[in-house]
């Protein structure tokens, strides 16, 4: 009799236990960079604060180093809801929404601050609306930083020095076309495969911010650091719309609040660490040089003409007002 009553009590309790378990939403936050990079440091801070302030309703866990896949794989996972959150560079979004390419056009911004203002203003709102239609919710502007060219052959001073150089780019049409305009031989490759490709000599060169060059140990396979600053790289904390729409409104607001807060913190980390990364890269043996920036800016003007029609009058108008 006691056993039957106990079993009956367990069966009655089961729906309540199931509902209690379902009350916690697990959010895996994936990215491709190393644990020492500012993306990951800020992501861990974001996760801790979300978990604490949601009182256990949300459980964010960070997966660095491409553990859940490369950028495109993770973004496709966001669309289907099989991955809940990610941090990606702006260029990763171009293959899902071509107009997002405006963010990392060559020499698009006079300063980081100008880019922040534009992407936290009407231009950023328009781009966020476009990717929301692709199943991705933008929770905050983060940063990759200024990108520079490294290579194993020679210093790059003029665009002519890139002629014939095999350079890896992200899987991004804009970046490929930029380096074609500069005379290089670009080819896209997923970030997770880049170190071994450089090590094997499949590429002569690559381009990334100082923080990524250092934390990914590219100084082991590259000799020259030419400060081209050809692209300011944005980054974004994204959530799967399928998952986000199932979260209660107060917790959605919390994710947005903390996504923006930790984005600001991460951007400060990038700014504060650039000089230190440059010093450490020099200590590792990399040879730095400045470039003829006006010559590079002139050489990429055809890329702007090529993409004007891709971005369309609305996005180009918002961009021009942002930089006026």
Residue ranges: model-predicted function:
Residues 3-4, 18:
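Short, intrinsically disordered low-complexity segments
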